[in-house]
């Protein structure tokens, strides 16, 4: 009895057309993974987002994380900060270092930084004089960008699935806070001070990232009043501008209301 043995030969995909189809398939697959990660962040499912990110990084798919981070910043998503924080405290510090802009790492690590208002290119500081409550008015300094007067660091606080920041001035050991009263320059804008305590939501802030002319910037909002930190239009004899809380929409104007966060 004779048996006919048939061998199946599988040829590798070597033609340009076949290779192109394979690349398109991989690109489509990565796009789906990007959308899944983006949506997890957008819906506040940060634990899932961290798990996905750690998995993609272990598989050599860091480009997925990079693209998602870029899109979050371009789209001005506040959730970018929560995602970054959860990575930072959840074994994902290397991911933050590799795929987030430097200023995110400076914020999360509590490094000394300068907070510079983009519109006037002035660094935030606290004034040298105090009121009866030992509070100091916050200004944008007309000259200084190098001394301890303009040195700050951020202290993180996680609450109700959100990350907030206490903004600590290292020169005077005081915390940035928003006043309950408005300034005389505008009846709607609130005065911003440095104070000794940080036990209320007036001393807590949240950030919204943005991109403008290839720069990564931040809108800085007070938690209690939801007002954005800005510098006023009035200039004093030293070239300083008073810091106030802007009562109005700012997200559409990063060229005017946003801040650089840079190493000190």
UniProtKB/Swiss-Prot annotation:
<comment type="similarity">
    <text>Belongs to the 30 kDa lipoprotein family.</text>
</comment>
<dbReference type="InterPro" id="IPR042046">
    <property type="entry name" value="Lipoprotein_11_N"/>
</dbReference>
<dbReference type="Pfam" id="PF03260">
    <property type="entry name" value="Lipoprotein_11"/>
</dbReference>
<dbReference type="GO" id="GO:0005576">
    <property type="term" value="C:extracellular region"/>
</dbReference>
<keyword id="KW-0732">Signal</keyword>
<dbReference type="InterPro" id="IPR004943">
    <property type="entry name" value="Lipoprotein_11"/>
</dbReference>
<feature type="signal peptide">
    <location>
        <begin position="1"/>
        <end position="23"/>
    </location>
</feature>
<keyword id="KW-0964">Secreted</keyword>
<keyword id="KW-0449">Lipoprotein</keyword>
<protein>
    <recommendedName>
        <fullName>Low molecular mass lipoprotein PBMHPC-23</fullName>
    </recommendedName>
</protein>
